[in-house]
UniProtKB/Swiss-Prot annotation:
MF (Gene Ontology): DNA-binding transcription factor activity, RNA polymerase II-specific; RNA polymerase II cis-regulatory region sequence-specific DNA binding; zinc ion binding
This protein's UniProt keywords: DNA-binding, Metal-binding, Nucleus, Repeat, Transcription, Transcription regulation, Zinc, Zinc-finger
Start and end residues, zinc fingers (C2H2-type): 165-187, 193-215, 221-243, 249-271, 277-299, 305-327, 333-355, 361-383, 389-411, 417-439, 445-467, 473-495, 501-523, 529-551, 557-579, 585-607, 613-635
Record-given protein name: Zinc finger protein 780A
Subcellular location as annotated: Nucleus
Native organism: Homo sapiens (Human)
InterPro entries according to UniProt: KRAB, KRAB_dom_sf, Znf_C2H2-type, Znf_C2H2_sf, Znf_C2H2_type
Length: 641
């Protein structure tokens, strides 16, 4: 057997706390990946070494500078265990030990020749031959990193010392050619490690190994607290923080704490506004390279992760996992405040901010604060009007790619999520979950002013603005203000006249998809929502809720001018226009003005003569559905109350 002299210390790199702080987040990630992979190579090739402290810390995603070195007379206990103490002596300046050539080959493949320090040119040529698997009896002798002089490649890793390997693309310097080669694959796009299951390729072997566990389903790391299993030790360690609540790293800007320093570094870029990673397709900037890679999949439309239940495809594995929980109903993350459960930890974290009221992200334009950064980014589009994602079917633009994807399913007609209660289909799992609350009648969010309850927190926020009078969304065309951004968007289509949603039955067009859906029920006669008090059916859940207040007699909305009370807020708004005399909707044909938009629409049919609603009994046509319903009473003999 051909042997060479390599120890774990030969391929290990140590950092002080000061040196570690000099590294960028992607450099720290690369360091973790390479160190863990090299250690796994040594173990897989038969090296019986005890686990070094630095490996334990890296597996726990802690900082490697936290290693406490203990000076002992036995400097290499792991190598003595494998090869005997007589071959590894503290008095031996070379700190030599013979290792199989396969070990040296594996290490050199990962780290490059610069990982080792040779005492003369002859030894370098011998090592070069060993790298190429040349046959022969080569006794390689290499000096441990702990014996290296300060001019060696190991010393050059410290952030303020020499880094001889420069990337010609971006000018970044590296201490070893192997690190430069790995870095260059970012620019070249080279991904030599390909998954045979789904064809996905990776730059690093350790990334490939992690990915394969998604297909095999292997989850060897189990949480002792709750029994949940994970494919990677790092995932288990992150999960443990849920139980311990430990967050050591605090942001000095806003006081937010994190359980990992890398998360703190990422968070700090939000305050600094630094976004060094730019998409060449659309110019969008990101503060992390990983976010850029995720974003680029939007342009390539790559979706390698497919659901075995319904065939739906996703860009990212976590999206597939989240989607699968819709089929299984699994919700492992529960809120201790209200007992609500969630499919993802991120959703639980978002939900918990409802109870704490924390809103650290503030809009510089209008001062509005948000609990999540992505909510702030969405809000900013109201001020900028930016909508980079356009539908090729109808030309409609969106400010988020996810909104475009949702919209495209309208044209495709795909509705893979079906309600088991009533059979209604949805194009998104989130919409199905929202719909199911109609059947369960769950309403956990209660208004403190009037005790009105809501299914969703966003509904409570919108409702609260009725009491406060807050209307932050203003139309730039007519100055009208709204308490919801979606209401402003709906209103703006009045000025543009855009009606992209057309009924295939009668050709009638609508501004909103919701209006088209409601209209289509006129043709089908579908009324899935039944009142348990009187048995009356309704096309929409909101109509049923309005109807229920007839039985309860509750009228929470009172006019401050005259004291008249109403069951619905929209009825109060209509009534208030009697006092103000406001009539913003004017007919272009004759100049007549109306208080309500629906009054204008009715009036315009006098000019057009349009009568799309026909009685199936006698063939008589009407301009409004209410007129048709009144007419039907003639045939049925029913007297309207």
């Amino acid at each position: 057997m051909v042997h060479g002299s390599v120890t774990f210390r030969d391929v290990a790199i140590d950092f002080s706390q000061e040196e570690w702080e000099c590294l960028q987040p992607d450099q720290r990630t690369l360091y973790r990946d390479v160190m863990l992979e090299n250690y796994s190579h040594l173990i897989s090739l038969g090296s019986s070494i005890s686990k070094p402290d630095v490996i334990t810390l890296l597996e726990q995603e802690k900082e490697p500078w936290m290693v406490v070195r203990k000076e002992t007379s036995r400097r290499y206990p792991d190598l003595e265990l494998k090869y005997g103490p007589e071959k590894v002596s503290p008095e031996n300046d070379t700190s030599e030990v013979n290792l199989p050539k396969q070990v040296i080959k594996q290490i050199s493949t990962t780290l490059g020749i610069e990982a080792f320090y040779f005492r003369n040119d002859s030894e370098y040529r011998q090592f070069e031959g060993l790298q190429g698997y040349q046959e022969g009896n080569i006794n390689q002798k290499m000096i441990s990193y702990e014996k290296l002089p300060t001019h060696t490649p190991h010393a050059s890793l410290i952030c303020n010392t020499h880094k001889p390997y420069e990337c010609k693309e971006c000018g970044k310097y590296f201490s070893r050619s192997a690190n430069l080669i790995q870095h260059q694959s970012i620019h070249t796009g080279e991904k030599p490690f390909e998954c045979k299951e789904c064809g996905k390729a990776f730059r690093l072997h350790i990334q490939f190994t992690r990915h394969q566990k998604f297909h095999t389903g292997e989850k060897p790391f189990e949480c002792n607290e709750c029994g949940k299993a994970f494919s990677l030790l790092t995932l288990l360690n992150r999960h443990k923080n849920i139980h311990t609540g430990e967050k050591l790293f605090e942001c000095k800007e806003c006081g937010k704490s994190f359980n990992r320093s890398s998360n703190l570094v990422q968070h700090q870029s939000i305050h600094s506004g630094v976004k060094p990673y730019e998409c060449k397709e659309c110019g969008k900037g990101f503060n992390r390279g990983a976010h850029l890679i995720q974003h680029q999949k939007i342009h390539s439309n790559e979706k390698p992760f497919v659901c075995k239940e319904c065939g739906m495809a996703f860009r990212y594995h976590y999206q597939l996992i989240e989607h699968c929980q819709i089929h299984t109903g699994e919700k492992p993350f529960e809120c201790k405040e209200c007992g609500k459960a969630f499919t993802l930890l991120t959703k639980l974290v978002r939900h918990q901010k409802i109870h704490t009221g924390e809103k650290p992200f503030e809009c510089r334009e209008c001062g509005k604060a948000f609990s999540l950064l992505n909510q702030l980014n969405r809000h900013k589009n109201i001020h900028t009007g930016e909508k980079p994602f356009e539908c090729k079917e109808c030309g409609k633009s969106f400010n988020r790619s996810s909104n475009l994807v949702q919209h495209q399913s309208i044209h495709a007609g795909i509705k893979p999520y079906e309600c088991k209660e009533c059979g209604k289909g949805f194009n998104r799992g989130a919409h199905l979950i929202q719909h199911q609350k109609i059947h369960s009648n769950e309403k956990p969010f209660v208004c403190r002013e009037c005790e009105m309850a809501f299914r969703y927190h966003c509904q409570l926020i919108e409702h609260s603005r009725i009491h406060t009078g807050d209307k932050p969304f203003e139309c730039q065309d007519c100055g009208k203000a709204f308490n919801r951004g979606s209401s402003l968007v709906q209103h703006q289509s009045i000025h543009t006249g855009e009606k992209p949603y057309e009924c295939k039955e009668c050709g009638k067009a609508f501004r909103l998809y919701l209006q088209l859906s409601q209209h289509q029920k006129t043709h089908t006669g579908e009324k899935p929502f039944e009142c348990k008090e009187c048995g009356k059916f309704f096309r929409r859940g909101s109509n049923l809720n309005q109807h229920r207040s007839i039985h309860t007699g509750k009228k929470p909305f009172e006019c401050k001018e005259c004291g008249k009370a109403f069951r619905l807020h929209m009825h109060l708004i209509r009534h208030q226009k009697l006092h103000t005399g406001e009539k913003p909707f004017e007919c272009k044909e004759c100049g007549k003005a109306f208080r309500l938009h629906m009054q204008l629409i009715r009036h315009q049919k006098l000019h057009t003569g349009e009568k799309p609603f026909e009685c199936k009994e006698c063939g008589k046509v009407f301009s409004l559905p209410t007129q048709l319903n009144r007419h039907k009473n003639i045939h049925t003999g029913e007297k309207a109350s």
